[in-house]
Amino acid sequence: LKAQTDKGLIRLGNKDFKHGNYSEAEVNYRKSLEKEYNAKAEFNLGDALYEQKNYEEAAKAFSAVTERNTTSEIEADSYYNLGNTMMAQEKYAEAFEAYKNSLKINPNDEDARYNLEYARWKLIQQQQQQQQQQDQQDQQQQDKEQEEKDQQQQQQQQQQDQQQQEENQEQQQQQQQQDQQQQQEMSKE
């Protein structure tokens, strides 16, 4: 009777899932798992969470299935769905690893093979974009440092120009004083 109840909850969850009632399906799968662990219920829970865009919890469910002793089909499908979940979160390196693990178990899965290559492509794009952003930040930092250096040089040049101007004025004043003294001396004679 206990196994019947657990399977009944799974069937009820499957029915809810089929009709698009993902939150109800989630509840039924969780109730089933509370009674007794069942890899299929955990897998289906992951699917229900994924459909609700609760990717972190879905990833936990799929990962839990892969860590249990299950059939190779469920394990391969769990890795595949884990890959899809990681792709939805733009975690391309993790998605790549999940698809790779799925293909180790089921090397004939063409969908997993396609998704593996797509994840690889997205990962390369992401890395290139990150490199471009880093290069841009580095360039901005260099530009800022150069601008500060230019401003310092400009200030130093202005100070030097001002000092030179003051020295020139002082020399002119001294020269004028000397000229006046000479004129006074000449006028006395």
Predicted regions mapped to residue ranges:
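TPR-adjacent "capping" and linker segments in tetratricopeptide-repeat scaffold/adaptor proteins
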Residues: 1-8, 69-72
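Alpha-helical segment of the N-proximal tetratricopeptide repeat
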Residues: 4-35, 51
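Short, charged, low-hydrophobicity "junction" segments
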Residues: 28-36, 89-96
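Feature detects intrinsically disordered, low-complexity acidic/polar segments
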Residues: 47, 52-189
